[in-house]
């Protein structure tokens, strides 16, 4: 595409300690009302005008300050995780560190990045609904713990025994998308495992709050203080989105068709 050709033409492959730093994020974009497109159309309420809403998913090079990929979705069908895996899978970049916020926390996303040969650094939830909640972690404000977690969607009696070791085994239900395990299996089919390698890192950011990060960066090369610094760099994509939408006038698009955005 023209976008990808342009990105490659200005690509200087600037690296941070030998790694290309990419951030991924999403942002909504209003376009002119088009009621013929129900997947993005929102009728006006309380005197407001009707509009159509798109969701832009983008991958941004934090050192070169350029977008290296983007995927536009209609708002009612938006799926940031699907957009992330699509951009990772189709990328021609051989090695990169992908930084992302909590909305991208999923085993499937981590698996796609790992299988690409990239590294990831993603802020994750501290509560009961995320990856960290299923692991036995230190009850401290600061730690750095490695994991080699085997995922399976099988639930035989033997597997249930293995799952008691929750720092080494995890069951993935068939309702959760995971592209590296068979979607269906018969009762007597052998169990299939997919192994994820990562660290869970936690550190305080104030007297009352902590951040929790999942990453597969090598601990000896990137200790905890480097993880703090790298995560702070992720905010560069927030600034770039703000500049794109306000400074460059992306808030005032007149196209009614997604293809023209």
Set out the residue ranges of the language-model regions:
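Single, function-defining residue in the core of a domain
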Residues: 1, 16-20, 24-37, 45-261
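Internal glycine-rich, Lys/Arg-flanked active-site/core loops of soluble domains
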Residues: 1-10
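P-loop NTPase switch module centered on the Walker A-proximal segment
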Residues: 13
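Extracytosolic and intramembrane catalytic regions of membrane-associated proteins
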Residues: 42
